């Protein structure tokens, strides 16, 4: 009895999870003609637009379906013929009246006579257990038309029972889930699982990346094992993580309804499908049901040379701070990606000196085999006449949004050759490190060129051929961040000379906290507490910063106990570092609060040390989903001369992080200028000042203001006060391209690009007469982000273009008056006002040229401000720059 009950339950559950019928898929009755209506429509908008604001189009028709053959040995093996007739094309959703691009146009005029004939030729489907085994059509039909037929054919693929399986249809090989109910089946396609060959790429860093969501749901209403209605809806939505106003949405709908059935032709006899197909028409060929790539030919578009001529003025040096320069740069990159090597090389060779650097930025950023060949043919690394162009090429390589192995291989080949400039040789190796990291992030760590590059970097540190090459390989490792390089970094950090030791600790500072193990911290603690040798303040404070990323109780306790025993300015610096961690609630703050509960650690004498060095972190912007932070720390020598200033900007979105910029100015050995005594461990340092920068996670080659006492004096005597440029150029920062095969047969495309023109410069001024020094770091940028979303049927196209642009600036000024002790220090961070402009263009366009366009724009002004630092700094600035008394305008003598 129990066994019977179990069998009954199994039978009942099977029955309730499937639609009534004897087949596993759709089944047609013999000698019946099924007459249906079919429509596919598509809507595009900017993501949050109202339906009535969308653009798009609708293709509708009648559809005739007949059963041509059924396998005598099984009902689930059949061949059906599907014929599209009475085609019409119109606006989707709202009617535009006279503004409609279809107004007064017949279907043959819109689609084209040949296209319409191809669309209305019958197609054959071989269905086995409800799935399309073969799709038969005629050879050499236009791809766009074939895809529309594939979109309709895919609707006939379904099963009548619940379950999850993999299916091949127009979208590719996809995971599909069926939910069967009484006379109804819901089919959910997991679009993110679809395997289909399509071109595309995206930016690896999530902060600069694109978030997307795709859904596909098809509902079948079934009667007598055939459909009475099919409703399919596919949605594709995206948004740029960094700028949520850059967004788009595509909604594609299909509708198939049974209107009537009537007497149809007799079935074709036979046991073999091949014979049946041949009997219908020998010209039928089996072709893939997976959507094919629709290549778009640009009619009447300008040549590359004509395009360059039209935008060249925008890329002249004096115009680079404007958004128009970046907009032209982005548009030209798109054209370069479809151009041949010869065309690109011709423009490079013909261009004049002042615009060539910007052209090199664009050609390198195109990242195609042709553009790479052209730029490598053009540049001569053995010549010192094009050093600026060589450096711009290398920086563009470092910022590459989707580098490939070929680019890395090209730089490795160049590194093995000879150079006119040692600076360029160093830059090549530093950028090789950046490419290694990007390729590894994209699962390319085992590529042959990556393995070779890693071996070169690590080998250069293990056994450098020349002592001066050590810095170069450390900078390369600072970009590559290879875990296997950590033991070498610890060796150089502890045993290396001052500048090398400091650089090695700054490299460790860039590693993720998971790599800062107890073994690493053991070495860093020895450096900070000087257990084996005396280290410079810059080395010790950097070692402490790495330890405080993830400190143990004893790490924190020993660092806090050291405050009060350190050199004067280092005391103050470490004190403000701890206060900054607590103020900004950094990960180490909880451990520090625990340790501060000990009376021996937390006492007034330790935490009341005077000095001018400082560390401070604050927010530039903050929202529930994103934050932008700035941090500024300055370390002085005991005599009041700048030792190091470090300005950082980070962008966070969720758990993703982007090191937007870092500008470090370092100086040493300058005490002799004011007859001051150097700090412990820094008595024999050569006079030096220089600047180092990280930009968008890429370490650039440092620049030197002066090196050595004689160089310092000559620079002081001949100083013009002009800033030294650290990096200047056009950068492609956001780069997302995606071809999408919609299940309706239409082709969609998403292009999102973001670029900027950037100029980071720095200067250091001394006045022995006024006993004052000034340090300036100036950032100027123009940013443009564009997106273009299109849906193309080959004869009609709809699209939404969005653009956001701004011009902004950030300046840091540090003024030190060292005529007394404690010396006076004033730090200022000024954010310039920034205009923000947003544009949106929606359009519909026929291949014949007729179009509809809708435009919107929005402008606002973000006010400038002075970013706040700590209270002590504000008080000091009031002393350095006392408020001016109001002038008396009475006009009298008394």
From Swiss-Prot:
Q: Which InterPro entries match?
A: Lipid_transp_b-sht_shell, Lipovitellin_superhlx_dom, MTP_lip-bd, MTTP, Vitellinogen_b-sht_N, Vitellogenin_N
Outline the extent of the Vitellogenin domain. 28-658
Q: What induces it?
A: Up-regulated by FOXO1. Expressed in a circadian manner in the liver.
- Per the annotation, which location comes first and is thus the protein's main one? endoplasmic reticulum
Q: Which keywords are on file for this protein?
A: Cholesterol metabolism, Disulfide bond, Endoplasmic reticulum, Golgi apparatus, Lipid metabolism, Lipid transport, Lipid-binding, Signal, Steroid metabolism, Sterol metabolism, Transport
GO CC terms on record?
Answer: basolateral plasma membrane; brush border membrane; cytosol; endoplasmic reticulum; Golgi apparatus; microvillus membrane; receptor complex; vesicle
Q: Name one GO biological process term.
A: establishment of localization in cell
Q: What happens when the gene is disrupted?
A: Lowers plasma and tissue triglyceride levels, and increases cellular free cholesterol.
Q: Where is the signal peptide?
A: 1-21
Give the superkingdom in one word: Eukaryota
User: Which GO terms fall under molecular function for this chain's record?
Assistant: apolipoprotein binding; ceramide 1-phosphate transfer activity; cholesterol transfer activity; lipid binding; lipid transporter activity; phosphatidylcholine transfer activity; phosphatidylethanolamine transfer activity; phospholipid transfer activity
Catalytic activity, per the record? Answer: a 1,2-diacyl-sn-glycero-3-phosphocholine(in) = a 1,2-diacyl-sn-glycero-3-phosphocholine(out); a 1,2-diacyl-sn-glycero-3-phosphoethanolamine(in) = a 1,2-diacyl-sn-glycero-3-phosphoethanolamine(out); a cholesterol ester(in) = a cholesterol ester(out); a triacyl-sn-glycerol(in) = a triacyl-sn-glycerol(out)
- Disulfide bridge positions per record: 174-194
Q: Where in the cell is it found?
A: Endoplasmic reticulum
Report the protein's function: Catalyzes the transport of triglyceride, cholesteryl ester, and phospholipid between phospholipid surfaces. Required for the assembly and secretion of plasma lipoproteins that contain apolipoprotein B. May be involved in regulating cholesteryl ester biosynthesis in cells that produce lipoproteins.
Subunit field text: Interacts with PRAP1.
Tell me what this protein is called.
Microsomal triglyceride transfer protein large subunit
Q: Which organism is it from?
A: Mus musculus
């Amino acid at each position: 009895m129990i066994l019977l009950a179990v069998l009954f339950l199994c039978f009942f559950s099977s029955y309730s999870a499937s639609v009534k019928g004897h087949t596993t898929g759709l089944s047609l009755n013999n000698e019946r003609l099924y007459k249906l209506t079919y429509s596919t429509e598509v809507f595009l908008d900017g993501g949050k637009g109202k339906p009535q604001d969308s653009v798009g189009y609708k293709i509708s028709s009648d559809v005739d379906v007949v059963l041509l053959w059924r396998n005598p040995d099984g009902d689930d093996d059949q061949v059906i013929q599907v014929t599209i007739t009475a085609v019409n094309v119109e606006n989707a959703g709202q009617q535009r009246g006279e503004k409609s691009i279809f107004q007064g146009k017949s279907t043959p005029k819109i689609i084209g006579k040949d296209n319409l004939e191809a669309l209305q030729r019958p197609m054959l489907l071989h269905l086995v257990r409800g799935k399309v085994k073969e799709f038969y059509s005629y050879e050499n039909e236009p791809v766009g038309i074939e895809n529309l037929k594939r979109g309709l054919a895919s609707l006939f693929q379904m099963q009548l029972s619940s379950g999850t399986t993999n299916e091949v249809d127009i979208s590719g090989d996809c995971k599909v889930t069926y939910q069967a109910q009484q006379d109804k089946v819901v089919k959910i396609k997991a679009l993110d699982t679809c395997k289909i060959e399509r071109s595309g790429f995206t930016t690896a860093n999530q902060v600069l990346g694109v978030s997307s969501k795709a859904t596909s749901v098809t509902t079948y209403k079934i009667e007598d094992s055939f459909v009475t209605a099919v409703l399919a809806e596919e949605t594709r939505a995206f948004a740029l993580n960094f700028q949520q106003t850059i967004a788009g949405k595509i909604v594609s709908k299909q509708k198939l309804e049974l209107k009537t059935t009537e007497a149809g032709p007799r079935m074709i006899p036979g046991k073999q499908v091949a014979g049946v197909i041949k009997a219908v028409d020998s010209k039928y060929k089996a072709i893939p049901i997976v959507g094919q790539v629709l290549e778009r030919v640009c009619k009447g578009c300008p040549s590359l040379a004509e395009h360059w001529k039209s935008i060249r003025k925008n890329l002249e040096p004096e115009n680079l701070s404007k958004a128009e320069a970046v907009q032209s740069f982005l548009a030209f990159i798109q054209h370069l990606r479809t151009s041949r090597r010869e065309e690109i090389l011709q423009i490079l060779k013909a261009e004049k000196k002042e615009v060539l650097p910007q052209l090199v930025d664009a050609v390198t950023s195109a990242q195609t085999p042709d553009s790479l060949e052209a730029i490598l043919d053009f540049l001569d690394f053995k010549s010192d006449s094009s050093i600026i162009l060589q450096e711009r090429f290398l920086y563009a390589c470092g910022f590459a949004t989707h580098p490939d192995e070929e680019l890395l291989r090209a730089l490795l080949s160049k590194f093995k050759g000879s150079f006119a400039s040692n600076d360029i040789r160093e830059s090549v190796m530093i950028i090789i490190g950046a490419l290694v990291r990007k390729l590894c992030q994209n699962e390319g760590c085992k590529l042959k060129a990556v393995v070779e590059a890693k071996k070169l970097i690590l080998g250069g540190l293990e056994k450098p051929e020349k002592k001066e090459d050590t810095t170069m390989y450390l900078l390369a490792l600072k970009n590559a961040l290879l875990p296997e390089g950590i033991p070498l970094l610890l060796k150089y950090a502890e045993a290396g000379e001052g500048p090398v030791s400091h650089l090695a600790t700054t490299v460790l500072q860039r590693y993720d906290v998971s790599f800062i193990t107890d073994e690493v911290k053991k070495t860093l603690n020895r450096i900070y507490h000087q257990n084996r040798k005396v280290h410079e303040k810059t080395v010790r404070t950097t070692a402490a910063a790495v330890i405080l990323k993830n400190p143990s109780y004893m790490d924190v306790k020993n660092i806090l106990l050291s405050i009060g025993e350190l050199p004067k300015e280092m005391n103050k610096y470490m004190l403000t570092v701890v206060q900054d961690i607590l103020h900004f609630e950094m990960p180490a703050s909880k451990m520090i609060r625990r340790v501060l509960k000990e009376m021996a650690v937390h006492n007034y004498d330790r935490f009341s040390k005077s000095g001018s060095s400082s560390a401070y972190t604050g927010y530039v912007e903050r929202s529930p989903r994103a934050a932008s932070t700035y941090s500024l720390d300055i370390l002085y020598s005991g005599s009041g001369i700048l030792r190091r200033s470090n300005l950082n900007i980070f962008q966070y979105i969720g758990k993703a992080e982007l090191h937007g910029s870092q500008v470090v100015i370092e100086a040493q050995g300058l005490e002799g200028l004011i007859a001051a005594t150097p700090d412990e461990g820094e008595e024999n340092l050569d006079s030096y000042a220089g600047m180092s920068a990280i930009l968008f996670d890429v370490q650039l080659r440092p620049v030197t203001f002066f090196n050595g006492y004689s160089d310092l004096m000559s620079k002081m005597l001949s100083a013009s006060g002009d800033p030294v440029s650290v990096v200047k150029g056009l950068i492609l920062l956001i780069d997302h391209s995606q071809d999408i095969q919609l299940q309706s047969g239409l082709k969609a495309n998403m292009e999102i690009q973001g670029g900027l023109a950037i100029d980071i410069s720095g200067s250091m001024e001394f006045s022995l007469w006024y006993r004052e020094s000034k340090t300036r770091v100036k950032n100027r940028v123009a940013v443009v982000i564009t997106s273009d979303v299109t849906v193309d049927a080959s004869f009609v196209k709809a699209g939404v273009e969005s653009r956001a642009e701004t011009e902004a600036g950030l300046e840091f000024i540090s003024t030190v008056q060292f005529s007394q002790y404690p010396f006076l220090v004033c730090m200022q961070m000024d954010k310039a006002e920034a205009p923000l402009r947003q544009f949106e263009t929606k359009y519909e366009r026929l291949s014949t040229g007729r179009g509809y366009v809708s435009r919107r724009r929005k402008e606002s002004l973000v006010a400038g401000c002075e970013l706040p630092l700590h209270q002590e700094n504000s008080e000091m600035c009031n002393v350095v720059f006392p408020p001016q008394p109001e002038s008396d305008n009475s006009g009298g003598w008394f």
